[in-house]
Amino acid sequence: MKVFAKKVFKGENPNIKQWDEPTIRQFNGKEVYGRRTKGYGTSEFNYAGKLYKPEPWTEDMELIKSKAEKWASEIMNRPIEFTFCLCGLYETGDDSIPHHSDTIPTLDDVVLGVSFGGTRVLEWSNYANPIKAHTNTSQVDLNNKGEPETTQFLVEDGDVYMFDGHSQMKTTHSIPPLIGCQRRISLTFRSGL
């Protein structure tokens, strides 16, 4: 399952006052310079080699989280609770994420992303066969999987996208570099942690 919707969160503002500094790490044999990030919630989360011990939800983040849970619960037709949010700052068009598959605890858990600020492209690549052994990993095997069908979506201020563990078994996604774009904040809420 994957869902994209326009302007659901238009007018909201996470008001993140202080960001954690980025880290440099290896990803698919390449050195990747990360973005500035911040973690909020009640559960720890390991992302890109860093263990996030989240800050408590701020009032602004709690409002957005509640709206995200309500929206996700309506789409999924069952209660959804988000226990962690990874906030990412894209200061310029050089800030990007290569194609990857998210770690999701179970096939039924969900990730919901909300975009604030500048417009970016979200690339979504679908493979015919599974690219992961199980959903609770970000390790992918693209050998002999064939060419993916890739779709691009413009992600604008207030837009939301959501996917579950089932979708991550056969897909990757990325935010490629984009020259001349404005500052963007991404909130990625997670269930099942």
Residue ranges of predicted features:
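Non-heme Fe(II) oxygenase metal-center motifs and adjacent flexible, charged/small-residue loops
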Residues: 1-193
